[in-house]
Amino acid sequence: NDYPIIDYDFQAPISRYGACRAHGDRLRLMHLFISDFDTEISTKQAYFPKWNSTDPMDISFLKCSVRSDNDGSGYFFAGAYEKGLKYNDFKDVQVAFSIQGKTINLPSIDVKAGAMFFYPFNIQLGSVQFDYILAQPVAKTQKDGKTVCYFAQCEGITPKCSINGKVQALALDEENSIDDVSIYVISYKEAKRFHFIDGKPYFLDGTVYCDNGKILCEQVSDIDLKNEITLTQTSKRKLPYNHYLLSTGKRCYYELKLPENILKEHKDVVLEFDFDGLNLQVFSGNRIINDYFNIDRKFIMNLRDYKEYIEKDSTLIIRTAPKTKFGVSNVYNEIEIPLHSNALSLASAKVIKTEEV
């Protein structure tokens, strides 16, 4: 595969600029589970059912598995999502399996297309032995003699638990007290905002991190500096790395003029461009400082990463290349890109605000 020279973002959960993406929020729940709920998960044996088919494109059955210890305590995992495939909903999914001669029957559930989750069975929390808890575990701690547990709602599934065969509902977003156990089931939407820091829960938007004992939250503000920035098409420039645009089409050149003091007045500003071309490169003078392979028609650039260049010269040059019917234009795109277009426009220039929680 062909790759950019600079931009190795690859749609990671944490972007190259440190922003937490939506799938990063989802992945954080898994990380918290491993670090703050069950540190022994990796020692549990994985079990898989006999598949109806070995065809990787077969979406007629639910992909699922179990991880369990020798005592039959573990987790049921289910997934109705695979990139490039379109699953249907699964109705009345019933699961039964045997571990160490003991048969375990899990509750019947409906699994929505696109859903991915897991929940525990035969698990002890505090002094309570649960048959199962139909919610995804995230974190637990001890407080005032109680085991306090945080769960996330499994997408599209009403949370409940079973103790000695007796089923009881679990309320969302409030305490469920069962003997010496407190269970909080966070709604599916709110769970994406959940953070667990030093044994305390936080619900925060944006990118959250700790620095010298402080909890900081970075968010894109409503302050838009777009009208203070100009993007104009300009004449051809002699610049290096032309081949790495991987297009046989005609190049286009843009001049991006930024306010000279933009990074003295603001810690960071995120530029968002609408882009219909194949690839682009950004230059400060003759030095390439950024590039982008078009995966979603949204070119993002956080200015703080380029502070040393902007302070020397607040004008940057952007060179674009179009997608063509024939030629090299075979780089990785997840969306349809129009042929022969170099269209680039500045959609917004939002100030990034950092606040202590």
PLM segments and residue spans:
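Carbohydrate-binding surfaces of carbohydrate-active enzymes
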Residues: 1-215, 349
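Short beta-strands within extracellular/lumenal beta-sheet-rich domains
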Residues: 248-261, 299-301
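Short beta-strand-plus-loop segments that form exposed binding edges in beta-rich domains
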Residues: 317-325
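A short acidic/small-residue loop/turn micro-motif
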Residues: 290-298
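Exposed low-complexity, polar/acidic, P/S/T/G-rich flexible segments that act as propeptides
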Residues: 326-357
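Aromatic-lined ligand-binding clefts that engage carbohydrates, nucleic acids, or primary amines
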Residues: 262-285, 292-293, 318
